[in-house]
Amino acid sequence: MHRASLVLAAIATALVARSGSAQTRPTRMDQLQSAEFLVGSWSCKHTVGDFSGTYTTTYASTLGDRWLKQTYDFPATGEDGPVHAEYFLSYDGRIDRWVRFGAHSNAQYYGMFGKRADNVWSWSYVLPGTSGSAVWTKKSDVEYTVDGPSYPQNGKVVTEHHACRKGS
């Protein structure tokens, strides 16, 4: 009888611990709320190796407020024309990860999974290949940075660095 009581107590403890951890896991809405500061228009500066430039990006709630739509507009540089890009990002509670995917007017496309810890989103690229990562850091409600990805360019490895400020 004593052994059966111990087994039942162990099972009950495991169930209570499991339900407690499920309750502390952020909900989809909690996760989406953490990114609400992004909604609006941003002016960004970026460097990639020896290159530096500016661009604008805008975030808007879409698809029933379950997704954020991000648009980029990069001006023409050198021989390259302007580039427009559209991305969607949201939190998927089924896999406990953020997802982000989109395409550019120059035929580039990317897909990513991400995790958020406080004000930091760590993204891993999954399309077109599984290499590369980027870290988004919320500095304030009107400023964030992006560091990464790193990749080879003109015989050396470069890392992208972006600093964005929200417009008024």
What feature does the model see in each segment?
Residues 8-15:
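Bacterial N-terminal signal peptides
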Residues 1-7:
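Bacterial N-terminal signal peptides that target proteins for export
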Residues 17-19:
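N-terminal signal peptide c-region/cleavage motif recognized by signal peptidases
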Residues 22-168:
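Hydrophobic small-molecule pocket/channel-lining residues, especially in calycin-type beta-barrels
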